[in-house]
Amino acid sequence: MVLANVDPRRSESISVLICDDAADMRELLVQIVGQRDGLHVAGEAADGIEAIAEARRLQPNVIVLDLSMPRMTGLEALPEIKRVAPAALVVVLSGFSASIVAADVLAAGADRYLEKGASPTLIRETIEGLVRTEARAVAPLMRG
């Protein structure tokens, strides 16, 4: 569990938890997220068990979750992540073809599925788009 780019003054920005067992992929995702104003990496996890613990502790806006991880896969961790961080939006980013696993991932509670190899722009736009969509859905309820 390595924390990166934690800045409590950035409460207005979108906090992102990066979960991937490959250190080089986590580093790449940290760079991708960090390149955009309004996004920051709140933390990192290297397996499903760490992902659950960090989701509980950090309560991020968005979790980027790999499927193939040791100790507990992303798919196994997903229901517990949604339980401990119910407001978090989950983007599964995996090397598996979308045609093979996307339906299962979305049925398990993920909000979006992207294949690894997606462009940095698509990854950032997916994260921001999810949060904007969620904000629009919640705003009428808050006005009450």
Enumerate the language-model features and the residues they cover:
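Non-catalytic signal-transmission and effector/linker regions of two-component phosphorelay proteins
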Residues: 1-15, 124-144
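Conserved acidic segment of CheY-like receiver
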Residues: 12-33
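Conserved sequence signature across two-component system core domains
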Residues: 19-20, 45, 63
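Acidic catalytic/metal-coordinating carboxylates
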Residues: 47-50, 73-76
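Active-site beta3 strand of CheY-like receiver
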Residues: 58-64
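Receiver (REC) domain active-site loop signature in two-component systems and cognate sites
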Residues: 69
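Alpha4 helix (beta4-alpha4-beta5 surface) of REC/receiver domains from two-component response regulators
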Residues: 76, 97-114, 118-121, 125, ...
